Design a protein with these regions (language model features):
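FIC/Doc superfamily catalytic core
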Residues: 2-17, 22-27, 31-33, 40, ...
Length: 323
């Protein structure tokens, strides 16, 4: 059905149809748990055919309770971050250096998704060139990713860059869908960013039980919003990345999207984005497989930790040392 012929219902009608209170429907709309919902002033336009949203509060039985970060000491990382956070002046250098992290971020992310795009190709694209071998879709993904991460950096602040108004916590189910829609800008502008229609084993369920992707995303965001906020940001963002890779909510550009979401979460806590260069992607895949099979995040977290330490050291170099 095209956008011009889409029919909508209001909150009261949806509440009656789904057997929920109007207040609960508004909350689910604001959290992004209603497919295709559109904000209309103070109200919400809900597609007539939208399925009843899953409520994370009622899905605790399938939450992933097997996530294990392992023993670790983040004193070195937090010390670097603290030093960087009190740095004054030189906002221009921080922005330039942050932008320089994006080509290796993208080259590695594409490699993670099985696409061979070199660091130099991305750098050339961002310098205004048209590098051979890049498709239009790949170019748009590069530009859209840059937009998402630069916007997140401006909203949440980074080092001497002051934060603007932003949500706390920064991510939500609605925000993730909005990020994915931005990622698809110019590629699929008609997408409602609905979850793929599939059922997969849940991380915390015993036996061989499977649950729809929509249910698993609801419980993932419930855990993120209610249970993981007290965790160290590196652990929380790593759990988010691992679960997004397990669920693969949209079915396209899964690795890139999961790494973008992790980067946004890290930025909201005052850290730069994680940068895993293409040559370390085999290590990332191996570490990720441990999280899927055993819930063991220790190696994955250590990989991301070393990446953040390198990025923080770059961001704190003297201006004259940067070439």
């Amino acid at each position: 059905m095209g956008m011009a012929t889409m029919q909508y219902m209001n909150v009261r009608t949806a509440a009656q149809k789904w057997g929920l209170t109007e207040r609960r429907v508004r909350i689910l709309c604001s959290e992004g748990r209603v497919d295709g919902v559109i904000r209309n002033g103070w109200g919400w336009n809900i597609p007539i055919g939208a399925p009843k949203p899953q409520d994370g509060r009622r899905l605790r039985r399938i939450k992933n309770i097997g996530l294990r970060p392992g023993a670790a000491n983040y004193a070195a990382l937090d010390g670097l971050k603290e030093t960087f956070s009190v740095q004054k002046d030189d906002q221009g250098y921080v922005v330039r250096t942050f932008r320089s992290l994006l080509p290796p971020f993208l080259s590695g992310s594409f490699c993670f998704d099985g696409v061979d795009i070199s660091l130099r190709q991305v750098e050339s694209l961002f310098e205004g060139g048209f590098p051979a071998g890049l498709t239009q879709t790949q170019m748009l993904l590069c530009f859209n990713t840059r937009t998402i991460l630069l916007r997140a950096m401006q909203e949440t602040g980074l080092g001497p860059i002051f934060a603007g108004p932003h949500d706390e916590p920064y991510l939500s189910e609605r925000k993730l869908k909005r990020l994915y829609r931005t990622l698809l800008s110019g590629i699929d502008d008609l997408s409602l960013c609905e979850y793929r229609k599939a059922s997969i084993p849940a991380g915390g369920a015993g036996g061989y039980k499977v649950f729809p992707v929509s249910q698993q995303m609801a419980i993932l965001m419930y855990q993120y919003e209610k249970e993981w906020q007290s965790l160290h940001p590196l652990i929380r963002s790593s759990f988010l990345f691992g679960e997004l890779m397990r669920i693969r909510p949209f079915g396209s550009f899964d690795g890139l999207f999961a790494l973008i979401a992790m980067g946004c979460e890290l930025l909201s806590a005052g850290y730069p984005v994680e940068v895993i260069p293409a040559e370390r992607i085999p290590e990332l895949r191996a570490d990720l497989s441990l999280t899927q099979k055993r819930g063991n995040y220790q190696n994955l977290i250590a990989l991301f930790e070393s990446s953040l330490e390198r990025s923080l050291q770059l961001l704190m170099r003297k201006k004259e040392e940067h070439v």
